Amino acid sequence: MNKPFIKICGITNTKDAALATSLNVNSIGFNMYEESARYIPKEKVKEIIRELPENTIPVMVFVDPTFDYVRSCLDISPKIIPQFHGKETQEFCSSFEREYIKAVRVSKKEDLELGSQNYSNAWMILFDSYINKQFGGTGKVFNWNFFKGQNIDKDYL
C-alpha cells in the first residue's frame, strides 16, 4: 500500500506551520490569491519557509496569476511547488521549469479524465469541487462515485 501524501493548505503563520510539520505532513500550502480569506504576503511566506524542516514541501497556491507574480514568488526558494487553481494552461503551468500541481474543478465525471489529460505533465492533479466563483479549498465534497471506472494515470490529491 502506498503512503498517502498529506498537504495542509491555508497556512498563514509560523505557529500553524510548526504544528503541521510536527504532525509529519508532506507539504504545507500558502494561498497567494489576494481575494482569499487565507491570503498571505510572499514576505511572510519567506519567513515561514526558513523554519520548515528539509523534508516538508512548500506549495504556493495561485489563481489566474501573471507570469511575473508567480516568478517573483517562486524566487523565494527552489523548493516551492506552484499549485494553479484557475484557468491556467498547461503551457503556462510548465513555463516555470519545475514540478507543479494543477487543480481541476469537478462538477461531472468527465472532468476527472479531462483534467488529467489536459495537464499530463503536472506532478499531481488536485480534484476540487466546482463552486461558481470560488476557487480552492471550497470545503465541499464532489461525488466521489465519479472515480468509479476511471483510469487516472496521474497522482492526485
Which ranges hold each PLM region?
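Conserved N-terminal beta1-alpha1 strand-loop-helix module at the mouth
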Residues: 1-157
